[in-house]
From Swiss-Prot:
GO terms for cellular component: chloroplast thylakoid membrane; photosystem II. This is Photosystem II CP43 reaction center protein. One of its GO terms (molecular function) is chlorophyll binding. The modification Phosphothreonine is found at residue 15. The keyword Chloroplast applies. The gene is psbC. One of the components of the core complex of photosystem II (PSII). It binds chlorophyll and helps catalyze the primary light-induced photochemical processes of PSII. PSII is a light-driven water:plastoquinone oxidoreductase, using light energy to abstract electrons from H(2)O, generating O(2) and a proton gradient subsequently used for ATP formation. [CaMn4O5] cluster binds at residue 367. Its main location: plastid. The chain crosses the membrane at residues 69-93, 134-155, 178-200, 255-275, 291-312, 447-471. Binds multiple chlorophylls and provides some of the ligands for the Ca-4Mn-5O cluster of the oxygen-evolving complex. It may also provide a ligand for a Cl- that is required for oxygen evolution. PSII binds additional chlorophylls, carotenoids and specific lipids.
């Protein structure tokens, strides 16, 4: 009878296995992991693990390309993107592809090209993944020492980290190049309701860029999520690209210091936990960005933010009632506060009613109506443009609320439509994924630390009923 569990203390989860179906070096007996443990079987097979990662990248890129083409096939130019359940085309539009003034889609060819390029790339990655998983060398150390590694080799691990940082830095630089030289990006703040423009006056001041990191995350401060200026966003990517490339070169050229060697656990599962922690942070930040920020995620493509939809409703009814003869500057609401306008805690003129809680909102359709002390009464009476009225009425009925089963909008809003905002989808999905990755970080970090400390004994399986049942085969 074959051994039912490995004696290696860190291979702790074992199941019965079918001895007739064996892949050399990838079965439970040789690796200590059952088939369902996935890539854990490949921990010490760098060539096969490379195949798994390349194939995984192929699946990711295939989804991007296929979903991109699916959205193009279903796209209706007459309707806004956020009213069609799109999550990929808004990203392409934000980069300035295929859109013009006001976010109007002028050409869908760039979207089609993007989808096809991703599909072709996924085929290349897929072939590479299959080759390395099935045909290539099991380990890279002998044939390709530059690409080979041992998990405990601290110097090699930081070299790999450095390579990744350089690639990330180059990725950030691609956005900078697109914004500066290749037709520009979409700026929701461009006069008259947004347009594609080249960025000509980058913000490179470290006090401005790093000032965002020092802001508190609360209220109108909003940490880095509060950025509302494309010059700052692109300038931030210049800094990001520079720091990542510089950090990458540093990690390639240097060996870990003694304090780092002592502080970190140096094994595959520990690196997995570090990666999961980083991805978790990315997920939470992306959640906040897509929910609150209407500059990096323009409302023309993603729909209004929650505060934006609320303020749009107040603005829409102010316009209507002002036309009907209401004196919006002095009308009193049912609570004794201003019905249409009131004062904020700092004395600025803001919209009255329930939307007072969102008085911090900044939006391109509203800012032209502000003066030095908040909303300017004379501008509200004389300067409201038709495009501002249209946009606020549209945003009012497309709040990013509702459940994810397509019953959306404000529950009490009689003009709401059956609609779920991409902001709802993207924010909630990234929060959930970020949370799962956070838990995964703790799980794998705990296992790695326990194994390093020498007390990871695993689960005692001796009394499990399944061990006394007949094999399935």
């Amino acid at each position: 009878m074959k051994i039912l569990y490995s004696l290696r203390r860190f291979y702790h989860v074992e199941t019965l296995f079918n001895g007739t179906f064996v892949l050399a070096g990838r079965d439970q007996e040789t690796t200590g992991f059952a088939w369902w443990a996935g890539n854990a079987r490949l921990i010490n097979l760098s060539g096969k693990l490379l195949g798994a990662h390349v194939a995984h990248a192929g699946l990711i890129v295939f989804w991007a390309g296929a979903m991109n083409l699916f959205e193009v096939a279903h796209f209706v130019p007459e309707k806004p993107m956020y009213g069609q359940g799109l999550i990929l085309l808004p990203h392409l539009a934000t980069l300035g592809w295929g859109v013009g003034p006001g976010g109007e889609v002028l050409d869908t060819l760039p979207y089609f090209v993007s989808g096809v390029l991703h599909l072709i790339s996924s085929a290349v990655l897929g072939f590479g993944g299959i080759y390395h998983a099935l045909l290539g060398p099991e380990t890279l150390e002998e044939s390709f020492p530059f690409f080979g590694y041992v998990w405990k080799d601290r110097n090699k691990m930081t070299t790999i980290l450095g390579t990744h940082l350089i690639l990330l830095g180059l990725g950030a630089s691609l956005l900078v190049l697109k914004a500066l030289y290749f037709a520009g990006v979409y700026d929701t703040w461009a006069p008259g309701g947004g347009d594609v423009r080249k960025i000509t006056n980058l913000t490179l001041s470290p006090s401005v860029i790093f000032g965002y990191f020092l802001k508190p995350p609360f209220g109108g401060e909003g940490w880095i999520v509060s950025v509302d200026d494309l010059e700052d966003i692109i300038g931030g990517h210049v800094w990001l690209g520079f720091i990542c490339v510089l950090g990458g070169i540093w990690h390639i050229l240097t060996k870990p210091f003694a304090w780092a060697r002592r502080a970190f656990v140096w094994c595959g599962e520990a690196y997995l936990s570090y990666s999961l922690a980083a991805l978790s942070v990315f997920g939470f930040i992306a959640c906040c960005f897509v929910w609150f920020n209407n500059t990096a995620y323009p409302s023309e493509f993603y729909g209004p933010t929650g505060p934006e939809a609320s303020q749009a409703q107040a603005f829409t009814f102010l316009v209507r009632d002002q036309r009907l003869g209401a004196n919006v500057g002095s009308a009193q609401g049912p609570t004794g506060l201003g019905k249409y306008l009131m004062r904020s805690p700092t004395g600025e003129v803001i919209f009255g009613g329930e939307t007072m809680r969102f008085w911090d909102l900044r939006a391109p359709w509203l800012e032209p109506l502000r003066g030095p002390n908040g909303l300017d009464l004379s501008r509200l009476k004389k300067d409201i443009q038709p495009w501002q009225e249209r946009r606020s009425a549209e945003y009012m009925t497309h709040a990013p609320l509702g459940s994810l089963n397509s019953v959306g909008g404000v529950a009490t809003e009689i003009n709401a439509v059956n609609y779920v905002s991409p902001r709802s989808w993207l924010a909630s999905s990234h929060f959930v994924l970020g949370f799962f990755f956070f838990v995964g970080h703790f799980w794998h970090a705990g296992r790695a630390r326990a194994a390093a400390a020498g007390f990871e004994k695993g689960i005692d399986r001796d009394l499990e009923p399944v061990l006394y049942m007949n094999p399935l085969n």
